[in-house]
UniProtKB/Swiss-Prot annotation:
Family: Belongs to the NAD-dependent glycerol-3-phosphate dehydrogenase family.
Single GO MF annotation: NAD binding
Gene name per UniProt: gpsA
Source species: Helicobacter pylori (strain J99 / ATCC 700824)
Keyword Cytoplasm: yes
Catalytic activity from the UniProt record: sn-glycerol 3-phosphate + NAD(+) = dihydroxyacetone phosphate + NADH + H(+); sn-glycerol 3-phosphate + NADP(+) = dihydroxyacetone phosphate + NADPH + H(+)
Any one of the GO BP annotations: phospholipid biosynthetic process
Pathway: Membrane lipid metabolism; glycerophospholipid metabolism
Binding-site residues for NADPH, renumbered to this chain: W11, R30, R31, K95, A127, R241, V265, E267
SUPFAM superfamilies assigned to the protein according to its UniProt record, in alphabetical order: 6-phosphogluconate dehydrogenase C-terminal domain-like (SSF48179), NAD(P)-binding Rossmann-fold domains (SSF51735)
Active site: K177
Identification of the protein by name: Glycerol-3-phosphate dehydrogenase [NAD(P)+]
Keyword Thylakoid belongs to the record: no
Amino acid sequence: MEIAVFGGGAWGRALAFAFGEKNEVKIISRRDLNEPLKKLNDALISKGSAPIEQVDLERGLKAALYVIAISVQHLREWFQNASLPKNAKVLIASKGIEVLNKAFVSEIAKDFIDPNALCFLAGPSFAAEIIQGLPCALVIHSNNQALALEFANKTPSFIRAYAQQDIIGGEIAGAYKNVIAIAGGVCDGLKLGNSAKASLLSRGLVEMQRFGAFFGGKTETFLGLSGAGDLFLTANSILSRNYRVGLGLAQNKPLEVVLEELGEVAEGVKTTNAIVEIARKYGIYTPIASELALLLKGKSVLESMNDLIRRA
């Protein structure tokens, strides 16, 4: 089966490689991917799979299934420009909350596609590990279980993909863990110790679940791969962009400098502000996100972390 992956960043390329084991994959990106795809295609060909082919948007839209790995902040614009066919089957692999409209991913997508044709990818994974073929377990959330299973069955041998409902819980967990991951990086950067880190992540998980429950997310989603699993991975690894943002802030570097040095998108930065504004609107208690928002605006890192540990 032919699958189109939209987005040529590290995550998009990793997903193209993963789906390429069993399927013909077309990737659509504004950047030239000839060099980045070379090693991935060599690996696919060695396994007897077809190489990933970069194509234009018109050609990509002819695929049977779509995987979208576009930054959440540009997702609405992408949908507007792409003009997906009415029968599109979509798996969104972007994690975050749209800052401009304070919208979750599914809220953006429903303006352009049938909600029953939408899936959301969640769970603990890094692009750098997927392209090495290292094993992981992910969750495909959808109100349409048949479609979720269809996508799950297309994943490679090294990925265990579960099909679950609760799409709102899955996408909130995927967005919120990036916020806690920044705080986790700060905690480690300040060398506050394992006990403080455990407290931070435990309370972060509770905060994530509290926020998600307000919008109908299920507790089991936040305690599973989509929530706890992704949180524990992202908040503890140097492979995490958001964790590295926290490490940079712990060195008293201005946020602008941290992001410039990162050279990649860290969705947790903008997601933090979106969560705080949504929480304020609905009266949801989010002490970690609220304190982190102050830190991102320039509050002293030591003062912020001390206040955070006491409040959370």
